[in-house]
Amino acid sequence: RASQTAAVIGGQLALPPVELGGIHEVQVGRLENRNDDEAVAEFNAIYERWHRGELEVPLPGGETGSEVLDRYLPVLTELRLRYLDDHDFHGDIVVVSHGAAIRLAAAVLAGVEADFALDHHLDNAQSVALTPITDGRWSCVRWGTLTPPFYPEAAEIPATPVADAVRSTTDPMG
């Protein structure tokens, strides 16, 4: 699907899409072609661990988060060095990929909080916009339909904290 999306975007921009090695979906191993609840839950649990810094955890028979980033980020760095850091280049680069890889790479590059990245999936054909800033760093200027600041969804607060406290059998004074 990413190739088809790239072809549509390329057609709109009158530019041929270019396939770049390293930019592709997460290799999910034994979870490939499965969409049952167990497979989705297993993927989501491991993917969450990646966002929380446990990048060496592999998908069953598939990639680790480190392997995804090790193939994906150098391509983005090369594009940045070749085009975006060149003061004679005055345009944008569109990289078409898959949501899980995009969210992981963008969160790492731009320092987007794990909870936000996990709470905000990208719909088909949605994008994340990164812009280069100083010292090789990136800033995330759009995530799907959202713009900064990027905060995780607020945790639900009990609707009746006073009533819940009154019903408690524990003496709040000690």
Locate the predicted segments by residue.
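Phosphate-coordination/substrate-recognition cap region in phosphate-metabolizing enzymes
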Residues: 1-47
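Short glycine/proline- and acidic residue-enriched helix-loop micro-motifs
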Residues: 46-67, 164-171
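Loop-to-helix element that buttresses phosphate recognition and phosphoryl-transfer chemistry
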Residues: 1-9, 55-75
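Active-site signature of alpha/beta-hydrolase-fold catalytic machinery across serine-
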Residues: 8, 104-108
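Short, conserved phosphate/pyrophosphate- and ester-handling motifs at nucleotide-, phospho-/glycolipid
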Residues: 98
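Glycine-rich phosphate-binding loops at beta-strand->alpha-helix junctions
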Residues: 1, 101-102
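Acidic, low-complexity terminal tails and accessory targeting/binding regions
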Residues: 15, 26-38, 81, 85-91, ...
